[in-house]
């Protein structure tokens, strides 16, 4: 029997194996830091200090994590249906367009708590619409979802540049961005959370969209494990043959799963667009769609695991900036190498330790 098919307890499969992958990634990263003449322990200390050493640091860490929760959930929903959605980046771009259009239309007339739910719907619809075409091509024409979603990432980026340069730009301005949203189009910061712990949020853009991300994670958990649709998606993801025998319509599930995936990716735009910059800008996604792939894989496609993995990558982003500031020898590119190692071990090599764990577990498990 293949080791991939041997069942392991959840504490091994979802806890110990990802932890081992993470430890190895950090050990190799420490070796790289040592090679360039810096102390790995000092770098690790700066990483933790930058991410959690102040209220502002925690705020930035959770701000980054918010975006990664949305995109991680987006990837996970598709994976449960047997689809590998590489297009969360592009879907987030288009979701940002929907979010910004709502904010621009309503910010002068209603308060933020009226604008926000409409912006959520707008971002979700635009993101889902961008995911629909690859989903339709996969379901009806057999086009591979990986290829089409990658192509749509580039189309989305080009479309966003065109719209910001030629349509949505403020007249007389050079910067390719919309006007700044008024107060009715800005999400409030969660400074009160930091106040509870006796610290200050500072300049960190940690905002209400974090709560929306947690609610989205709860929704995905209900959807995947407590609904008929979720059961059909998981059945299709495990075996298309079994799904066919069970009478589960392939095309319908593929399209619905991708629509949900695209909507979640689109909702990511709430965080940077309405919660941080208060305007739509080029490159506001900042690679969060691609990081979401690693977040989903490291979190084993489970909402709780995705939240924890998103916080880890938020730590790497915020703590990495702190390291590059305090240790000039460790450049931003070196931080990307460290992040890449974590992605490598969390994603591409996620089953590296599984054969050994299976062997050890079979040796010591109770009869």
Where are these regions (language model features)?
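Short, non-helical or kinked segments that cap or interrupt transmembrane helices
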Residues: 37-42, 79-98, 139-148, 232, ...
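Transmembrane helix-bundle core of multi-pass membrane transporters
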Residues: 149, 153-225, 279, 334, ...
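Single transmembrane alpha-helix segments in multi-pass membrane proteins
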Residues: 31-36, 42, 46, 51-106, ...
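Helix-loop-helix "hairpin" substructures at the membrane interface of multi-pass membrane proteins
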Residues: 194-279, 303-304
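Hydrophobic core segments of alpha-helical transmembrane domains in multi-pass membrane transport
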Residues: 18-34, 71-75, 96, 100-102, ...
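Transmembrane alpha-helical segments in multi-pass inner-membrane proteins
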Residues: 259-340
């Amino acid at each position: 029997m293949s080791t991939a098919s041997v069942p392991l307890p959840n504490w091994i499969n979802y806890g110990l194996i990802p932890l081992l992958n993470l430890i190895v990634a950090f050990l190799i990263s420490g070796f790289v830091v040592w090679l360039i003449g810096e102390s790995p322990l000092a770098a690790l200390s700066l990483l933790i200090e930058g991410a959690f050493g102040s209220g502002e640091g925690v705020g930035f860490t959770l701000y980054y994590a918010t975006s990664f929760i949305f995109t991680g959930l987006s990837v996970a929903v598709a994976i449960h249906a047997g689809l590998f959605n590489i297009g969360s980046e592009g879907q987030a771009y288009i979701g940002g367009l929907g979010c910004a259009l709502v904010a621009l239309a309503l910010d002068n007339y209603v308060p933020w708590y009226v604008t926000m739910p409409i912006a959520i719907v707008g971002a979700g619809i635009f993101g889902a619409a961008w995911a629909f075409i690859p989903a339709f091509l996969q379901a009806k024409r057999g086009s591979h979802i990986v290829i089409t979603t990658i192509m749509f990432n580039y189309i989305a980026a080009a479309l966003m540049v065109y719209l910001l340069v030629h349509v949505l730009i403020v007249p007389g301005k050079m910067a390719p961005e919309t006007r700044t949203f008024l107060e009715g189009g800005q999400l409030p910061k969660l400074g009160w959370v930091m106040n509870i712990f006796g610290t200050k949020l500072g300049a960190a853009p940690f905002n209400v969209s974090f709560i929306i991300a947690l609610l989205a994670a709860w929704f995905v958990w209900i959807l995947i494990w407590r609904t008929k649709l979720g059961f059909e998606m998981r059945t299709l993801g495990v075996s298309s043959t079994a799904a066919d025998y069970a009478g589960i319509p392939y095309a319908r599930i593929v399209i619905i799963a991708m629509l949900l995936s695209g909507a979640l990716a689109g909702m990511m735009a709430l965080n940077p667009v309405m919660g941080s910059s208060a305007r739509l800008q080029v490159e506001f996604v900042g690679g969060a769609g691609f990081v979401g792939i690693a977040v989903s894989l490291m979190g084993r496609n489970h909402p709780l695991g995705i939240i924890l993995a998103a916080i880890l990558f938020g730590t790497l982003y915020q703590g990495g900036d702190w390291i590059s500031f305090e240790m000039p020898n460790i450049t931003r590119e070196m931080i990307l190498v460290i992040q890449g190692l974590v992605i490598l071990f969390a994603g591409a090599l996620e089953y590296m330790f599984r054969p050994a764990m299976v062997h050890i577990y079979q040796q010591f498990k109770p009869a």
